[in-house]
Amino acid sequence: MESLRIYNTLARDKQVFVPRQSGEVRMYVCGITVYDYCHVGHARMLVVFDLVQRWLRAIGYRVTYVRNITDIEDKIIRRAVENGETIKSLTDRFIGAMHEDEAALGIQRPDLEPRATQFIPQMLGMIEKLETNGYAYQAADGDVNYSVRKFANYGKLSGKSLDDLRAGERVAANDAKEDPLDFVLWKRAKADDPPGATWASKYGMGRPGWHIECSAMGCTLLGEHFDIHGGGQDLQFPHHENEIAQSEGATGQTFVNYWMHNGFVQVDNEKMSKSLGNFFTIREVLERYDAEVMRFFIVRTHYRSPLNYSDVHLDDARASLTRLYTALKDVEPDALALDWNEPHAQRFAAAMNDDINTPVAVATLFELAGEINRTRDASLARQLKQLAGLLGLLGREPRAFLQQATGAAQAGGLAADEIEAKIAARVAAKQAKDYAEADRIRAELLDAGIALEDKPGGSTEWRRV
């Protein structure tokens, strides 16, 4: 099997993946700020790095996968105050909702899922190190800030120079900062902060800045120098750039070897975002589409490419996934183990080892489905299920997928018992040689989105289309 190659944002190129410790991978992914339901952009991040950790394990690595939860942040505080509830009540509620969404999408839980509020002492310890090393200072307003000009390599991840940032970036003015580009490490408490929003420190009561949270959790749980750090493309700057500055400023060593970023989700060629009002929650999508269809919609696009969200693309994903399940419908897979020397498995592995190239890997699944349709071969059916399983797909009994009702069918379509009753009426019509009535029932069912397949021996199977 070829070596895994990953596009490293830091190097701006694909690189052969070499872990720091042979056979082991330590990976940190920036998780979700829990003040609302997860949206499609979150779904993409969750699925992408679920695929990455699944593949790393499939090729034999022992993986420690950490994905954090941001449970203290200005948006969280504002929402809790608006709702008249405690911060913990709000965050616990949306963490539970996030876990429900993840389960629906087939996301395997990370090995460690730290909450920011569990690591306040470690954050303060890192801030004190930065102060000792000359990178941090307490401003007149009580905030502790990071002095970006003290870090010689600032901008190495994003490719942004400090001079360009000063000229072109929108930086919030703050007279207390030594430089407008400096960012906050510790926010001094405000008089109207609600309970649970601040902690005691040598700098006074306050709370951590967003960037220090991930630096402290990553270094504490995975060590000061680890293999992979991932997140959405929108986090590359300033969040991940600031993480590097903090972590390397505190420890004096390389923070992360490989940086991976998934692309944006777009609607009509614009980035999906709350500010534009064009975003959809996972729950809203799952009211209309099966969760595996949503996962497949994400999987079949390369993780670094833009993902264009539309009903047309989701409908196409549903039709494509239906083709894969249909190929397995009447073939019982054999029980042999996956053999990476099999040609389809080799092509699948080559694709996944080429920067997690899921479009090519999915194409291999359709090659297998086509051959199964021609040959009804049990070993090919087994390969299809095994390889798709590595992507978190095709885990259900085919008829369970093909006969399920989602979206419009669920809201106003025929229930399974109604369909079976009409099939029975059609069988009776055929037995009475009333073929016109039998054809009418078939057409009526097709109009309702139900396709019939007459099998040898007189039985009839159905599926939703």
Swiss-Prot record:
Per UniProt, the short sequence motif 'HIGH' region occupies residue numbers: 32-42
Q: Which EC class, in a word? A: ligase
Q: What is its EC number?
A: 6.1.1.16
Q: How is the cofactor bound?
A: Binds 1 zinc ion per subunit.
In chain numbering, motif 'KMSKS' region lies across 271-275
Reaction(s) catalysed by this chain, per the record, are: tRNA(Cys) + L-cysteine + ATP = L-cysteinyl-tRNA(Cys) + AMP + diphosphate
Q: Does the keyword 4Fe-4S apply?
A: no
Show the disulfide pairing: none
Question: Which compartment or compartments is the protein found in?
Answer: Cytoplasm
* Ligand binding (Zn(2+)): 30, 214, 239, 243
Main localization category: cytoplasm
Q: Which Pfam families match?
A: DALR_2, tRNA-synt_1e
- Report quaternary structure and partners: Monomer.
Which named protein is this?
Cysteine--tRNA ligase
- Gene transcribed to yield this protein: cysS
